[in-house]
């Protein structure tokens, strides 16, 4: 499967945190994805961009916090994360560029 332009719109960036590193030991990778993307779109994009087989996709939406900026109230954007579990034998090196 070849990568299309819309696949790059679905996957925004990999998330590299302590929790994401711990899940990578179990064969999962964490990505920030477009807020309007769904699980089949995420699965198709990861398989096309990285050439791996996806076993499961779990998503979470983190609501943006209300913050004060120069005396004005503002809101950070909502973030959607996708926990992508890979089939056995497949790996993704997230330290390389997309």
Curated annotation (Swiss-Prot):
Entry GO terms, CC: ribonucleoprotein complex; ribosome
MF terms in GO: rRNA binding; structural constituent of ribosome
Single biological process term from Gene Ontology: translation
Keyword annotations from UniProtKB, A to Z: Ribonucleoprotein, Ribosomal protein, RNA-binding, rRNA-binding
tRNA processing listed as a keyword: no
Function, as annotated: One of the early assembly proteins it binds 23S rRNA. One of the proteins that surrounds the polypeptide exit tunnel on the outside of the ribosome. Forms the main docking site for trigger factor binding to the ribosome.
Subunit architecture: Part of the 50S ribosomal subunit. Contacts protein L29, and trigger factor when it is bound to the ribosome.
Protein family according to the UniProt entry: Belongs to the universal ribosomal protein uL23 family.
PANTHER family: 60S RIBOSOMAL PROTEIN L23A
Protein name according to UniProt: Large ribosomal subunit protein uL23
Organism phylogeny: Bacteria, Pseudomonadati, Pseudomonadota, Alphaproteobacteria, Rhodobacterales
